A protein has these predicted regions:
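Short aromatic-glycine-(Arg/Gly/Cys) micro-motifs in beta-strand/loop hairpins
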Residues: 1-25
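Short N-terminal amphipathic alpha-helices
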Residues: 42-45, 52-58
Length: 215
């Protein structure tokens, strides 16, 4: 039996993880999202610009008998295809047509998995995604771009079994100061975007092996 410690950053003091709930338009669809990085959880707890302190809930996940899909072990295009299933990087007709083809070619069937593990698509990701679908980013620099984003790794609890294996640590609730961690969240995003723009504008970006050529 292997138990891992995970954290859920939120503006809510009371959280009840419930099977079947969650937003369809989150990165991996409906589910309960956590991270194994406490500092990132604190930043995510205050990512909404409402000047309210946040909360971090601590959990233990018993991974015994759980089927986990880890996108870090897959091609980055498979991860992008999964995000395209749930989130729109553009509202253009071109994107709607090409993203469907992209998902068909690179997407993974996630049905049957109890937990999905992978990068979190924050604001920096959407900057990359928009440039990628516009054919402004070469595939050769895509992985490096994503690493510059400091996206962080998240776990999405999907199945009823996974929810049953998730237990909150009763004395693990932490209060998060809005001003301190909102500043860190903003700094991370600004720094990431600056580094991304520099790489996209560099000679390393050949703009040859681009989104539309991968279909």
């Amino acid at each position: 039996m292997e138990k891992i410690t995970l954290f859920h950053g939120t503006s809510s003091r009371i959280v009840v993880p419930t099977y079947g709930l969650g937003e369809k338009k989150h990165d991996y669809g409906k589910g309960f999202y956590l991270t194994d990085n406490l500092n990132l959880a604190k930043e995510w707890a205050v990512c909404k610009p409402d000047d309210e302190n946040g909360w971090v809930h601590q959990y233990k996940l018993d991974t015994d008998r759980l089927k986990i899909l880890d996108f870090q072990e897959k091609d980055v295009l498979s991860w992008l295809a999964e995000l395209m299933k749930h989130r729109d990087a553009s509202d253009s007709r071109r994107y709607r047509v090409l993203s469907k083809k992209f998902i068909e070619k690179y997407g993974i069937d996630t049905e049957g998995y109890d937990v999905i593990k992978g990068w979190r698509a924050n604001a920096s990701y959407f900057y990359i995604a928009k440039e990628f679908v516009r054919d402004n980013i070469d595939m050769d620099i895509l992985t490096e771009l994503l690493s510059l984003g400091g996206l962080g790794i998240q776990y999405c609890i999907k199945s009823r079994l996974a929810y049953e294996h998730l237990q909150e640590v009763q004395d693990g609730l932490l209060s998060v100061d809005y001003m301190e961690f909102r500043e860190k969240y903003n700094h991370r995003d600004v720094s990431a975007r600056q580094k991304m723009r520099e790489l996209i504008d560099s000679d390393a970006n050949k703009v040859t092996n681009v989104f539309s050529t991968l279909l």
